Curated annotation (Swiss-Prot):
Its cofactor is Zn(2+). Catalyzes the ATP-dependent conversion of 7-carboxy-7-deazaguanine (CDG) to 7-cyano-7-deazaguanine (preQ(0)). It holds the Pfam family QueC. This is 7-cyano-7-deazaguanine synthase. It comes from Methanospirillum hungatei JF-1 (strain ATCC 27890 / DSM 864 / NBRC 100397 / JF-1). The keyword Nucleotide-binding applies. Coiled coil: none annotated. It catalyses: 7-carboxy-7-deazaguanine + NH4(+) + ATP = 7-cyano-7-deazaguanine + ADP + phosphate + H2O + H(+). ATP binds at residues 7-17. Zn(2+) binds at residues 187, 195, 198, 201. The keyword Zinc-finger does not apply.
Amino acid sequence: MKAVCLLSGGMDSSTLACLAKHDGYDILALHFSYGQRTEEKERECAKRIARHLNALEFLEVDLTYLKAVGASSLTDYAMQVKAHEDAGDGIPDTYVPFRNANLLSVATSFAEARGADAIYIGVQASDYSGYPDCRPEFIDAFQKVITLGTRPDAGIILKTPFVKLNKAEILKIGMDLNVPYEDTWSCYAENEVACGICGSCHYRLEAFRQIGIQDPIPYR
């Protein structure tokens, strides 16, 4: 069995890829460059995780048109990545408009071309409270798109094992799977030493605190 795993190099996607391997899949790692601030570090970490899993393939896809589209502090450097405490409610400014539809479209092409059985994406409970393209309803709808838009015998299943879990629960799974979290990166703002205050750093640090383990990456 083969699975395409969307692998950003972050905590969730790395745990996800390790879980897919544990589930018996050979890994086809798929990484995206879309002009995000921390792309250099993300790519480095994604490659390390792919090597850790003996991935069959590591495919990097350039989606820098999403940077040209703009409207996200991840890709528009004129916008500041806000501290978690300053972010407020509603859709965060780190939301990249309709990003997951773009990523999953490429993942579906890759999966169909390689004869993969599944696509793994690491959406989780704290994501869909703010990101509309992480909602379970969106994932269900995209499964229909995959089924209707691929060959009748493709049978590609979109898997979201973390969709009802919080970050601490995901981290517990990862610890059982011996995920090398020192080779992952979550910070939205920095490439060398994590800022510790952006939304992504906040939720990662909180997850480690909740299970009583020291996060192995450096913070300011």
